[in-house]
Amino acid sequence: RDYYASRGLGDVYKRQDVFIATDDERIAEACRTYGMEYCMTSPDHDTPTGRIWEVSTKVEADLYLQIMGDEPLINVKAFDLILPDTLPEDPYYVAVLTNRMEHPADVIDFSNQKVVTNAAREILMISRSPIPYPKGTLNFEYEKVTGIQLYSRRALAFYHETPKSILEKAEENDMMRFVENGHKVHAIVSPYKTVSVDTPKDLALVSEILKGKE
C-alpha cells in the first residue's frame, strides 16, 4: 500500500506549490526520496481537514486543495474542475469533487459516502446510507464524494474553531461541520473516477489497475 500511495504522490507532485502533510516519518522519507516538499504535522489530528488546517497556519495561501493520500488513482485533470479561475467571493469557500455511481452495489456500500445537493449544487447531506431513498422514482443519479476537496483559509480556521457537529460525528464526514453550521459546500461532478483504499478489496482493485499501467 505504501508503494502505491507513493506513486500517487509522485504523479500529483508534477503540479506546482504542493506540500505533503504527514505525521509519519516513513512518508516524510518518501517525500525526500522524490524531492518533494512536505509539512510535518501533529499526530493528534483525527480528520484530514484538521491536518490541512495546521498546514494553513504554516503555508500562506488563498485556497488549499486537499488530495487524500489513500486515493492513488487521482487524475490530475480533475484539479482543473475544482480550482476556480478567480478567487471566490465567499470567504468560507468549500468545494468537493464527486463521482457518479453506476452500480447498485456501490450505492449500498457504506464506505462510499453519498451526497445530495440542492439545485445550485450546494450539499444538503452526506451519508453512508443510500440517499435519497428511491420510493417514488428511480430517475436519480447517485453520487459519492471524493478525496479532492478545496478550502479557503478562513474556512479551515472556522473548521478548527468549531466543535464537531452531530451529523459529522454520525457519518464521520468532515464537511458536514460546514453544512450543519450554514456554510455552503459546493459539489462538482468529475468524470475522472477515483477509488478510496478503505478495505482489502479496494486495495486489490487499485493494485490491479496500477499494475496494468506499468
Q: What is the predicted role of each segment?
A:
Residues 15, 61, 89-92, 183:
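Short, high-confidence coil segments that cap the C-terminus of an alpha-helix
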Residues 1-13:
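Single conserved hydrophobic/aromatic residue that forms the stacking wall/gate
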Residues 19, 25-84:
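Short phosphate-binding loop-to-helix
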